[in-house]
Every structure is written in structure tokens, then in C-alpha cells.
From Swiss-Prot:
It catalyses: Hydrolysis of proteins to small peptides in the presence of ATP and magnesium. alpha-casein is the usual test substrate. In the absence of ATP, only oligopeptides shorter than five residues are hydrolyzed (such as succinyl-Leu-Tyr-|-NHMec, and Leu-Tyr-Leu-|-Tyr-Trp, in which cleavage of the -Tyr-|-Leu- and -Tyr-|-Trp bonds also occurs). It comes from Parasynechococcus marenigrum (strain WH8102). The gene is clpP2. This is ATP-dependent Clp protease proteolytic subunit 2. GO terms for biological process: protein quality control for misfolded or incompletely synthesized proteins. Belongs to the peptidase S14 family. It holds the Pfam family CLP_protease. The active site is at S96, H121. GO terms for molecular function: ATP-dependent peptidase activity; ATPase binding; serine-type endopeptidase activity. Fourteen ClpP subunits assemble into 2 heptameric rings which stack back to back to give a disk-like structure with a central cavity, resembling the structure of eukaryotic proteasomes. InterPro entries: ClpP, ClpP/crotonase-like_dom_sf, ClpP/TepA, ClpP_Ser_AS.
Length: 197
């Protein structure tokens, strides 16, 4: 069930689902596995927000166990394609493709809440069928592994061989460790205090 928010104005009351209300504030929430449905929604929201105001930042909050590499790369490419900077924030878990998208935010604008967990690993896949079909699938997984590792290396500043070693198995990090690794830029422990005027 999606929560509904009621807003009152001089013209009466309006009801919004919580995600639509957040979108008005330029906040997108990835709170599930990366699938074609979730990726299409996120890409559409990013394109909409860019059309609304190409100069204003977008905020992508991530609580995701990961998911489809192809669909995640669609989100990644959109993040790089649009004009607004994309702040990424881990809330809970950013694992696998979730961690990749967390790292894909604009440099200097990638963060995590203090008790979140971040995990990187190599792409997973399976194949069945004739030997030639299995080889095609294995080659594709190896290609994706190389592509993702190179992007992580470019974005974290870690040498490619370190990324290859660390993604060979599940590699969990605290937010502080993710900052040291270069996956994110800061840990959020509390909201900044607003000046009173």
C-alpha cells in the first residue's frame, strides 16, 4: 500500500501518493530490486525532472538489493546523459547494481546514511541450453563484468585490479569504508541545522 499525502491550499485539498509528492521536490526513490519496470519509472522521472528544470539537481535515494544489469545500465546511462547533477543517497542497503548506481551519482554528491550497508560483487547469471548458447551467455557476462569493473575503477579511483579482486565475491562496506574506497563522498549522520532568520 502506498501512503497518501494530503495538501491544503487556498483552492482546497489535494491528495498525492507519497512518491508523486517527493517527485515534486525532485526526489526519486529506488526502494526495490532493479527491474525493467523500476528502471523505466526512474528513467522517465529523471527525464521529466530534466525537462522541468535542467539546472536543478535531482536526488536519487537508494535502498535496493540490486537486480538486472541491463536495466541498471539504462538508469546509469540516463544519469550521465541528463544535464542536472544527480545526488545519490543510500538508505538501508545499496547492493550489487544498487551500489553501482550509488557510485554513479555526481562526484561530490554521493552519500549514505550512517547505518546503511553497501555491497559490490561481480554480475550474476545463469545459462542453459546447447554448449554454444552457454558460451555466448558466458562471454556476455564476462563483457558486463569488465564494463562494470572499469566504470567502478573510473569512479572510485581504485586500480582496476583491486576492483576485480574485491568484486570477485560479495564485498560489504560501511558508509565510512565506502568513503575511503571512493564509492561515495560523505556519510550523513544528521541534517544540517538551518539558520533562523
Amino acid at each position: 500500500m502506498i501512503p497518501i499525502v494530503i495538501e491544503e491550499s487556498g483552492r482546497g485539498e489535494r491528495a498525492f501518493d507519497i512518491y508523486s509528492r517527493l517527485l515534486r521536490e525532485r526526489i526519486i526513490f529506488l526502494g526495490e530490486a532493479v527491474t525493467s519496470d523500476s528502471a523505466n519509472r526512474i528513467v522517465a522521472q529523471m527525464l521529466f525532472l530534466e525537462a522541468e528544470d535542467p539546472e536543478k539537481d535531482i536526488y536519487l535515494y537508494i535502498n535496493s538489493p540490486g537486480g538486472s544489469v541491463y536495466d541498471g545500465l539504462g538508469i546509469f546511462d540516463t544519469m550521465q546523459h541528463i544535464k542536472p547533477d544527480v545526488h545519490t543517497v543510500c538508505v538501508g542497503l545499496a547492493a550489487s547494481m544498487g551500489a553501482f548506481l550509488l557510485c554513479a551519482g555526481t562526484k561530490g554528491k554521493r552519500s549514505s546514511l550512517q547505518h546503511s550497508r553497501i555491497m559490490i560483487h561481480q554480475p550474476l547469471g545463469g545459462a542453459r541450453g546447447q554448449a554454444s548458447d552457454i558460451r555466448i551467455q558466458a562471454d556476455e557476462i564476462l563483457y558486463l563484468k569488465e564494463r562494470l569493473n572499469q566504470e567502478l575503477s573510473d569512479r572510485t579511483g581504485q586500480p582496476l585490479d583491486r576492483i576485480q579482486q574485491d568484486t570477485d565475491r560479495d564485498f560489504f562496506m560501511s558508509p565510512g569504508e565506502a568513503v575511503e574506497y571512493g564509492l561515495i563522498d560523505s556519510v550523513i549522520d544528521k541534517r544540517p541545522i538551518q539558520a533562523v532568520e
